[in-house]
A protein has these predicted regions:
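Membrane-interface extramembranous regions at the lipid-water interface
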Residues: 2-37, 53-86, 117-138
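Residue-level marker of motif borders
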Residues: 24, 36, 42, 88-89, ...
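Structural signature of transmembrane alpha-helix termini at the membrane-water interface
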Residues: 26, 91, 103-110, 123
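Residue-level detector of functionally special positions within alpha-helical transmembrane segments
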Residues: 29-30, 47, 94, 111
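Short hydrophobic membrane-inserting alpha-helices and related fusion/pore-forming segments
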Residues: 42-51, 99-117
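Loop-to-transmembrane boundary segments
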Residues: 79-102
Length: 138
């Protein structure tokens, strides 16, 4: 009998993730973050040049609404184009979005009950630095 290769822990969406997502929407401002990213994405998609950036805003909006139980990883086939768009994104908006999420994360981390939400803001911050070439995973 061949031994199975261990592939790491399998993370499934749990009831805790569901409960934390509900609390995130109500207390953590998840609905506001989602609306901000949706509005920015819609405005960016009005121009041909802004469409790739608008699509990234839509990705961030989805994660902004229900961040618990979701993660992101490098997309297969992400290459030079993703790198170039990430550099442009970083210079134009990425740094400011990152700083806003870090400030919110630190503020939430100061309260005991806000620590799980602080981790989500730090996750947003990392994704906001370079969203191109990343894909969301459950």
């Amino acid at each position: 009998m061949a031994a199975r290769k261990w592939e790491g822990p399998v993370r499934r969406r749990s009831r805790v993730d569901f409960l934390l997502n509900i609390l995130w929407i109500i207390l953590g401002g998840g609905w506001l973050i989602c609306l901000e990213y949706l509005a920015a994405g819609a405005l960016l998609c009005l121009t041909v040049v802004g469409i790739p950036f608008g699509l990234q805003c839509f990705k961030l909006a989805k994660l902004g609404l229900v961040p618990f139980g979701h993660d992101f990883d490098d997309a297969p086939g992400a290459g030079v184009g993703s790198f170039a768009l990430n550099v442009l994104w970083l210079v134009v908006a990425g740094v400011w979005i990152f700083l806003s999420h870090v400030v919110l994360g630190v503020g939430l981390a100061l309260t005991i009950i806000g620590i799980p939400f602080a981790f989500q803001h730090l996750k947003f911050g990392m994704l906001a630095l370079a969203p191109f070439g990343k894909e969301l995973q459950r």
